Amino acid sequence: MADDRKAALDAALKKIEKNYGKGSIMKLGEKIDQQVSTIPSGSLALDVALGVGGYPRGRIIEVYGPESSGKTTVALHAIAEVQKNGGTAAFIDAEHALDPQYAQKLGVNIDELLLSQPDTGEQGLEIADALVSSGAVDIVVVDSVAALVPRAEIDGEMGDSHVGLQARLMSQALRKLSGSINKTKTIAIFINQIREKVGVMFGNPEITPGGRALKFYATIRLEVRRAEQLKQGTDIVGNRTKIKVVKNKVAPPFKIAEVDVMYGQGISQEGELLDMAVEKDIVDKSGAWYSYKEDRIGQGRENAKNYMSTHPEMMAEVSALVRAAYGIGEDVEIPEETQAELPLEE
């Protein structure tokens, strides 16, 4: 009887593979790749918080937060890292607000960046689907979900009610996109805004537009918020920003990366490297003084950052020590409970 069941199962598996291709069904432990393939986020602190050294390929990422918190900056740094590694990047600018000069300062090669400024939400998501399905694009950024306006809303009058249109649009699009994103190993970053529910007395009244679909389909959700202003004398030169990993399917969630987002420069590599080096006792902090190998590098954090920026060899040495201390760049195994979500490969 057992042999009959095994023969029937083998016949069914052969039929499935014949109809849908090799690798369409297999035993979970048979050929699965248990390593997460990632690309760096452009921030060492965020790479550590993500737990796998960057953004996992073939997954959906949501980046949300208040206005001017640094959401687009986070996405542009990811694009710059993809291009540094020889990849192709696309930016769906639904807000029609991308600043090419700022993107260039962050390291983005604007001559090679694919840019689309769609008229409707359907058009933007169809373009994203076409790019992902091609298999030739490594990262697609949609800025932002809130600006993906359904065609019916654009064609209608200003005061017309369109209940749930955007949520249905996102739900349908993500059903189509999720499979091809996984298959082509494309990283899809959706930037989102926040709104507030009216009449909420208890709990957090903040919600993200576009319905619940993106929350479910996203492997990682990042909440970006300004913590404090950074000043040089009386001039405000940037913001101290907290990036919280609210959801993470490939590593433990709820870790926080604190970075300096400098105006016109993006995330300060020196600032986060200095903080992480102090945390691991690679750089010594005594009072206001920072020292490396018994040599003082600056009094106060800003002076120490300036010293590191003018001494690239020392910065590279500290960076290597910090990466080794945090295990960045090493292969990371996926937790057993999330292995089932991996794409099947031939």
Swiss-Prot record:
Signal peptide (from-to): none
Superkingdom assignment: Bacteria
UniProt key word Electron transport: no
CDD domains reported in the protein's UniProt record: RecA
Gene Ontology cellular-component terms listed: cytosol
Family annotation (SMART domains): AAA
Subcellular location: Cytoplasm
Described function: Can catalyze the hydrolysis of ATP in the presence of single-stranded DNA, the ATP-dependent uptake of single-stranded DNA by duplex DNA, and the ATP-dependent hybridization of homologous single-stranded DNAs. It interacts with LexA causing its activation and leading to its autocatalytic cleavage.
Protein name per UniProt: Protein RecA
Species of provenance: Enterococcus hirae (strain ATCC 9790 / DSM 20160 / JCM 8729 / LMG 6399 / NBRC 3181 / NCIMB 6459 / NCDO 1258 / NCTC 12367 / WDCM 00089 / R)
Designated gene of the protein: recA
